[in-house]
Protein backbone atom coordinates (compact mmCIF):
# COMPACT_ATOMS: atom_id res chain seq x y z
CA UNK A 1 0.00 0.00 0.00
CA UNK A 2 2.78 2.41 0.91
CA UNK A 3 4.53 1.76 -2.42
CA UNK A 4 1.35 2.32 -4.40
CA UNK A 5 0.64 5.56 -2.57
CA UNK A 6 4.20 6.71 -3.24
CA UNK A 7 3.65 6.04 -6.96
CA UNK A 8 0.55 8.24 -6.87
CA UNK A 9 -2.05 5.47 -7.23
CA UNK A 10 -5.22 7.34 -6.24
CA UNK A 11 -7.19 4.09 -6.02
CA UNK A 12 -5.36 3.22 -2.80
CA UNK A 13 -6.53 4.94 0.38
CA UNK A 14 -5.38 4.28 3.93
CA UNK A 15 -7.28 5.14 7.11
CA UNK A 16 -6.13 4.66 10.70
CA UNK A 17 -9.07 4.69 13.12
CA UNK A 18 -7.99 4.53 16.79
CA UNK A 19 -10.72 3.53 19.29
CA UNK A 20 -13.40 3.70 16.63
CA UNK A 21 -17.09 3.29 17.66
CA UNK A 22 -18.32 -0.17 16.79
CA UNK A 23 -14.78 -1.61 16.84
CA UNK A 24 -13.96 -3.71 13.75
CA UNK A 25 -17.54 -3.58 12.44
CA UNK A 26 -17.56 0.20 12.78
CA UNK A 27 -14.23 0.49 10.99
CA UNK A 28 -15.45 -1.76 8.17
CA UNK A 29 -18.61 0.30 7.76
CA UNK A 30 -16.46 3.44 7.65
CA UNK A 31 -14.33 1.87 4.92
CA UNK A 32 -17.45 0.85 3.01
CA UNK A 33 -18.65 4.46 2.97
CA UNK A 34 -15.32 5.49 1.43
CA UNK A 35 -15.24 2.67 -1.13
CA UNK A 36 -15.83 3.44 -4.79
CA UNK A 37 -19.55 2.77 -5.46
CA UNK A 38 -18.52 1.04 -8.68
CA UNK A 39 -16.59 -1.65 -6.77
CA UNK A 40 -18.18 -5.06 -7.36
CA UNK A 41 -16.59 -6.93 -4.44
CA UNK A 42 -15.35 -6.08 -0.97
CA UNK A 43 -12.38 -8.03 0.41
CA UNK A 44 -11.63 -8.27 4.14
CA UNK A 45 -8.21 -9.34 5.44
CA UNK A 46 -6.89 -9.17 9.01
CA UNK A 47 -3.88 -6.93 9.61
CA UNK A 48 -1.56 -9.82 10.57
CA UNK A 49 -2.12 -11.69 7.30
CA UNK A 50 0.34 -12.30 4.51
CA UNK A 51 -1.72 -12.72 1.36
CA UNK A 52 -0.97 -14.51 -1.90
CA UNK A 53 -1.09 -11.85 -4.66
CA UNK A 54 -3.15 -14.22 -6.80
CA UNK A 55 -5.97 -14.57 -4.26
CA UNK A 56 -8.55 -12.25 -5.84
CA UNK A 57 -7.93 -13.46 -9.38
CA UNK A 58 -8.23 -17.09 -8.25
CA UNK A 59 -11.59 -16.80 -6.50
CA UNK A 60 -13.45 -13.92 -8.18
CA UNK A 61 -14.78 -16.19 -10.92
CA UNK A 62 -17.26 -17.70 -8.46
CA UNK A 63 -19.21 -14.45 -8.60
CA UNK A 64 -20.22 -15.29 -12.17
CA UNK A 65 -23.13 -17.01 -10.42
CA UNK A 66 -25.39 -14.05 -9.55
CA UNK A 67 -26.68 -15.88 -6.47
CA UNK A 68 -23.24 -15.98 -4.80
CA UNK A 69 -22.76 -13.30 -2.16
CA UNK A 70 -19.67 -14.65 -0.34
CA UNK A 71 -16.50 -16.44 -1.40
CA UNK A 72 -14.54 -17.62 1.64
CA UNK A 73 -11.00 -19.01 1.78
CA UNK A 74 -9.56 -20.80 4.85
CA UNK A 75 -8.35 -18.90 7.88
CA UNK A 76 -4.83 -20.33 7.88
CA UNK A 77 -1.91 -19.67 10.22
CA UNK A 78 1.88 -19.44 10.24
CA UNK A 79 4.66 -19.40 12.87
CA UNK A 80 2.73 -21.79 15.11
CA UNK A 81 5.63 -24.19 15.65
CA UNK A 82 7.04 -22.22 18.60
CA UNK A 83 5.30 -24.17 21.37
CA UNK A 84 3.18 -27.26 21.91
CA UNK A 85 0.19 -25.10 22.83
CA UNK A 86 0.41 -23.11 19.60
CA UNK A 87 0.76 -26.32 17.59
CA UNK A 88 -2.38 -27.66 19.27
CA UNK A 89 -4.25 -24.45 18.45
CA UNK A 90 -3.24 -24.71 14.80
CA UNK A 91 -4.32 -28.35 14.60
CA UNK A 92 -7.72 -27.43 16.01
CA UNK A 93 -8.20 -24.60 13.50
CA UNK A 94 -7.08 -26.86 10.66
CA UNK A 95 -9.64 -29.50 11.64
CA UNK A 96 -12.47 -27.02 11.32
CA UNK A 97 -11.39 -25.62 7.96
CA UNK A 98 -10.35 -28.96 6.45
CA UNK A 99 -13.41 -30.92 7.66
CA UNK A 100 -16.13 -28.82 9.30
CA UNK A 101 -16.35 -26.17 6.61
CA UNK A 102 -16.71 -28.85 3.92
CA UNK A 103 -19.68 -30.37 5.75
CA UNK A 104 -21.28 -26.96 6.09
CA UNK A 105 -20.53 -26.05 2.48
CA UNK A 106 -22.54 -29.06 1.29
CA UNK A 107 -25.59 -27.43 2.93
CA UNK A 108 -24.68 -23.86 1.92
CA UNK A 109 -24.15 -23.04 5.58
CA UNK A 110 -20.51 -22.01 5.95
CA UNK A 111 -19.36 -19.72 8.74
CA UNK A 112 -18.17 -16.48 7.20
CA UNK A 113 -14.90 -15.35 8.75
CA UNK A 114 -13.48 -11.87 9.15
CA UNK A 115 -10.44 -12.55 7.02
CA UNK A 116 -9.75 -13.98 3.56
CA UNK A 117 -13.37 -13.31 2.67
CA UNK A 118 -14.73 -11.70 -0.48
CA UNK A 119 -18.26 -10.23 -0.44
CA UNK A 120 -20.44 -9.07 -3.29
CA UNK A 121 -20.79 -5.31 -2.74
CA UNK A 122 -24.46 -5.30 -3.75
CA UNK A 123 -25.25 -7.99 -1.18
CA UNK A 124 -23.30 -6.17 1.52
CA UNK A 125 -25.07 -2.87 0.91
CA UNK A 126 -28.43 -4.62 0.68
CA UNK A 127 -27.77 -5.97 4.19
CA UNK A 128 -26.75 -2.48 5.42
CA UNK A 129 -23.17 -3.50 6.15
CA UNK A 130 -21.81 -5.02 9.33
CA UNK A 131 -23.72 -5.08 12.63
CA UNK A 132 -21.77 -2.87 15.04
CA UNK A 133 -23.67 -4.31 17.99
CA UNK A 134 -22.44 -7.87 17.44
CA UNK A 135 -19.01 -8.91 18.66
CA UNK A 136 -18.63 -11.46 15.82
CA UNK A 137 -19.73 -9.17 13.02
CA UNK A 138 -18.34 -11.44 10.29
CA UNK A 139 -20.37 -14.53 11.12
CA UNK A 140 -23.49 -12.49 11.83
CA UNK A 141 -23.22 -10.84 8.41
CA UNK A 142 -22.88 -14.22 6.71
CA UNK A 143 -26.05 -15.48 8.39
CA UNK A 144 -27.96 -12.34 7.39
CA UNK A 145 -26.92 -12.85 3.78
CA UNK A 146 -28.15 -16.45 3.91
CA UNK A 147 -31.45 -15.19 5.31
CA UNK A 148 -31.71 -12.86 2.32
CA UNK A 149 -31.25 -15.73 -0.12
CA UNK A 150 -27.59 -15.26 -1.02
CA UNK A 151 -25.31 -18.28 -1.44
CA UNK A 152 -21.73 -18.78 -0.27
CA UNK A 153 -18.77 -20.62 -1.80
CA UNK A 154 -15.96 -22.14 0.26
CA UNK A 155 -12.63 -22.47 -1.58
CA UNK A 156 -10.39 -24.83 0.39
CA UNK A 157 -7.10 -23.38 -0.78
CA UNK A 158 -4.78 -21.34 1.43
CA UNK A 159 -4.26 -17.86 -0.02
CA UNK A 160 -3.02 -16.17 3.16
CA UNK A 161 -1.92 -16.86 6.71
CA UNK A 162 -2.05 -15.02 10.02
CA UNK A 163 -0.85 -15.60 13.56
CA UNK A 164 -2.35 -17.85 16.23
CA UNK A 165 -2.97 -16.32 19.69
CA UNK A 166 0.33 -15.72 21.43
CA UNK A 167 -0.47 -17.49 24.70
CA UNK A 168 -3.21 -19.13 26.76
CA UNK A 169 -4.59 -15.80 27.97
CA UNK A 170 -4.95 -14.52 24.40
CA UNK A 171 -6.60 -17.80 23.39
CA UNK A 172 -9.11 -17.42 26.24
CA UNK A 173 -9.98 -13.89 25.12
CA UNK A 174 -10.54 -15.15 21.60
CA UNK A 175 -12.81 -17.98 22.78
CA UNK A 176 -14.73 -15.69 25.10
CA UNK A 177 -15.43 -13.37 22.17
CA UNK A 178 -16.54 -16.26 19.97
CA UNK A 179 -18.81 -17.69 22.67
CA UNK A 180 -20.35 -14.31 23.49
CA UNK A 181 -20.87 -13.57 19.81
CA UNK A 182 -22.52 -16.95 19.24
CA UNK A 183 -25.02 -16.22 22.01
CA UNK A 184 -25.72 -12.79 20.51
CA UNK A 185 -26.44 -14.37 17.14
CA UNK A 186 -28.66 -17.10 18.60
CA UNK A 187 -30.67 -14.49 20.47
CA UNK A 188 -31.02 -12.08 17.54
CA UNK A 189 -31.74 -14.70 14.89
CA UNK A 190 -33.78 -17.15 16.97
CA UNK A 191 -36.87 -16.63 14.85
CA UNK A 192 -35.13 -17.48 11.58
CA UNK A 193 -33.17 -20.36 13.09
CA UNK A 194 -36.17 -22.00 14.74
CA UNK A 195 -38.86 -21.35 12.15
CA UNK A 196 -36.61 -21.19 9.11
CA UNK A 197 -38.67 -18.67 7.16
CA UNK A 198 -35.90 -18.04 4.63
CA UNK A 199 -33.28 -20.59 5.69
CA UNK A 200 -33.11 -24.18 4.50
CA UNK A 201 -33.28 -27.06 6.97
CA UNK A 202 -29.59 -27.70 6.44
CA UNK A 203 -28.69 -24.11 7.24
CA UNK A 204 -30.85 -24.10 10.36
CA UNK A 205 -29.28 -27.38 11.49
CA UNK A 206 -25.69 -26.24 11.11
CA UNK A 207 -26.16 -22.81 12.65
CA UNK A 208 -28.06 -24.20 15.64
CA UNK A 209 -25.95 -27.27 16.38
CA UNK A 210 -22.70 -25.54 15.49
CA UNK A 211 -23.09 -23.17 18.43
CA UNK A 212 -24.54 -25.56 21.00
CA UNK A 213 -21.05 -26.64 22.19
CA UNK A 214 -20.54 -23.12 23.58
CA UNK A 215 -23.27 -23.85 26.14
CA UNK A 216 -22.38 -27.52 26.53
CA UNK A 217 -20.94 -27.19 30.03
CA UNK A 218 -24.05 -25.39 31.24
CA UNK A 219 -26.27 -28.08 29.71
CA UNK A 220 -24.22 -30.82 31.40
CA UNK A 221 -24.84 -29.11 34.72
CA UNK A 222 -28.59 -28.83 34.06
CA UNK A 223 -28.95 -32.45 32.93
CA UNK A 224 -27.03 -33.72 35.96
CA UNK A 225 -29.42 -32.09 38.44
PLM segments and residue spans:
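Active-site donor/metal-binding and catalytic loop motifs
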Residues: 156-170
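Positions that flank functional sites
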Residues: 78, 139, 160-161
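Long helical/loop segments within the catalytic core of UDP-sugar-dependent glycosyltransferases
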Residues: 4-40, 53-135, 146-147, 168-208, ...
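Catalytic donor-sugar/metal-binding loop of nucleotide-sugar-dependent glycosyltransferases
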Residues: 133, 142-160
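Membrane-embedded multi-pass helical conduit in multi-pass membrane proteins
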Residues: 213-225
Amino acid sequence: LEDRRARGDTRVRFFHLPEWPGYKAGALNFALLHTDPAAAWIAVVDADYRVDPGWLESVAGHFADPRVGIVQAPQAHRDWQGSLFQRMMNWEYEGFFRIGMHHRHERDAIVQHGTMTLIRAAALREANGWDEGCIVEDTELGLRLFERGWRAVYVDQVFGSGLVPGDFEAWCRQRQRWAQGAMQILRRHAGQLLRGTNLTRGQRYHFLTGWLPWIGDALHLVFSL
